[in-house]
Amino acid sequence: MRARMALYHSKINYEHREILLRNRPEKLYQLSPKGTVPVLELPSGDVIDESFDIMKWALSINDPEMWFDKHKEEQVDLIKLNDDKFKKWLDKYKYHVRFPEYPLEYYRKECEKILDIYEDRLKDKSFFFGATISLADIAVMPFI
């Protein structure tokens, strides 16, 4: 979702293909051996297979509302917190039967610790970095 939002925002034309993860086409593995989505094949033949990297690439082409113009380092740090920690705990919470090492409540509390960080950033403003939307807002939003 977040990669598509950045591509749309940047007004980049691309061919969108929905993939059933239980029936992944061979072409997906040819482009990216990981077999994960999203995958963006550039006109040059280069492939970007991480959503955050697709977002950064799209905004490097066209960033009309300057989502990634200010607070770049802080935005990257917040997105890394989301991608490296929050997503991990969220998956363990959602699929807790696969992770019996801890009770469900433990995973929930780990998620809440990170949500508290987000909440603190938003307590006196509409977006993570002020009055206007940023790349970090778009990158984190699909997971909340």
Pin down the residues of each PLM region.
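Alpha-helix C-caps/helix-loop-beta hinges
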Residues: V37, D124-K125, M141
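GST-like domain detector, emphasizing the conserved glutathione-binding G-site
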Residues: M1-E112, E119
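Surface-exposed helix-capping loop/turn segments at secondary-structure junctions
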Residues: D120-A131
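GST superfamily/GST-like fold recognition
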Residues: G130-I144
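Alpha-helical scaffold segments in carbohydrate-active enzymes
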Residues: L81, I117, P142-I144
